[in-house]
Amino acid sequence: ADHLKEGDRLMLKAPQAVVAPRLHGRGGFAANPDYLDADLFTRRFYAPAVKLLHGHLAGIVFEQEYRRAAERDPVEDEAADLERFFRRIPADRRYHLELRTEAYLAAPVFDVLARLGVGQALSHWTWLPSLAEQFARAGERFFNEGGEVLLRLLTPHGMRYEDSYAKAHPFDRLVDGMLSQRMLDEAAAIMRRAVDAGHHATVIVNNRAGGNAPLIAKKLVERFRQDPATDTV
C-alpha cells in the first residue's frame, strides 16, 4: 500500500479457502468446511484488506471454480447459499461474483445478484459460453451497486489452463491463432454498453488469453474505439 499512487485501483480475489467448496490437499480434493464462511472472510480477508488499501480497493472478486455435475448443488440451493453469505458479510458496493459453472448462469443466481447489488464478473474462460451469451443470460443487466462492470479475459474457449500457459509462454508476443477476435468484439461491445449506461468498465487481461496481456489490451482499446455500429452485442 505504501507504493500505491493517487488514483491506483486494485481488484482483489477473495481467498479460495472461503470461496471454493472443495480444496486440493495431499489426498486429493476434499470438502471445504469453511466454504462461504462469512465470519472467516470478514476477519481474515475483508477487514485487513480495507484497512490496508483504503480507497485503492476497487473491487473484490469471488471466483467460483467450475463444478462437474456430480459435485454441483441444484441452482436454487446454490443461490440460497450465496444470498446467505453475501447478507452476512459487510455491506459493500465492490463485490463481484465470477461463476465458472454454466449451469449456475441462471435466474435464481441472477436474482440474488440483483437484490444485493453484487456484480456479475463476465469471464472469457475455458468452459464458459461466450461473453455475449453470459450477458444475455443475465438479461443484459449490470448488477453491481457501485456501477462497476468487470470483465476477465483469461483463456481461449476449450483450452485448459496448462495448455494455454504453455502456448502463451514466454508471454512476449501475440501467438498466432490464439487470440479470439470474437472475444475482443464482445468485450468492446459490453464495455460500450456499460459506459453508455453510466457505469465504469474494468477489464482484467491475462497473458493466457492470447500470448501477451499488454498487446491484447491494446487490441481491445483499438476495437473499443471503432464505430459502435459494428458492435456485436
Question: Each PLM stretch: what is its role?
Answer:
Residues 1-233:
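Residues lining hydrophobic/aromatic ligand-binding pockets adjacent to catalytic sites
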